């Protein structure tokens, strides 16, 4: 089972494309939709939905995957639910760049203070990070600097922030999922 979390643009047709691409790895790909505008509510909703899926799951190596803001959530929810994560261009600093786009961006900073201390150290090697060198929305080098101590970083030379085509990375993701 692969759980897919969309980014801030929940209506992007690229979400359906990524789900179809992920089905080459596992036929059971589940998209969880969330508001993107209410961080504390989103966290509760995502935890509840992922837990529900895991309770009914027969796959002993589930994976959670997210792009952009979905990558932010996939890393955290995956850690809290003890499943491996794959994140594409994760938005690691939404409290800085979501101002004016959502109702309460400061909730992201509050969530960070309430998260497990040094959670990335405890999550070491359980997240695969795929970053675009041509991310027009986020500073991918800042993300790499933040994450490379804990996770493997894979650089993509062609995709932009929304990562329309993940197919060049499917074999790597499949191998990472298999390690589960």
UniProtKB/Swiss-Prot annotation:
What domain of life is recorded for the organism?
A: Bacteria
Please give one Pfam family short name: UPF0227
Q: Which SUPFAM superfamilies does the UniProt record give?
A: alpha/beta-Hydrolases
The record's section on InterPro entries has: AB_hydrolase_fold (IPR029058), UPF0227 (IPR022987), UPF0227/Esterase_YqiA (IPR008886)
Query: What family name appears in the similarity comment?
Result: Belongs to the UPF0227 family.
Sorted alphabetically, which NCBIfam families does this protein's record hold? PRK04940.1 (NF003431)
Tell me the protein's name: UPF0227 protein CKO_01948
Q: What is the species of this protein?
A: Citrobacter koseri (strain ATCC BAA-895 / CDC 4225-83 / SGSC4696)
What are the top taxonomic ranks of the organism?
Bacteria, Pseudomonadati, Pseudomonadota, Gammaproteobacteria, Enterobacterales
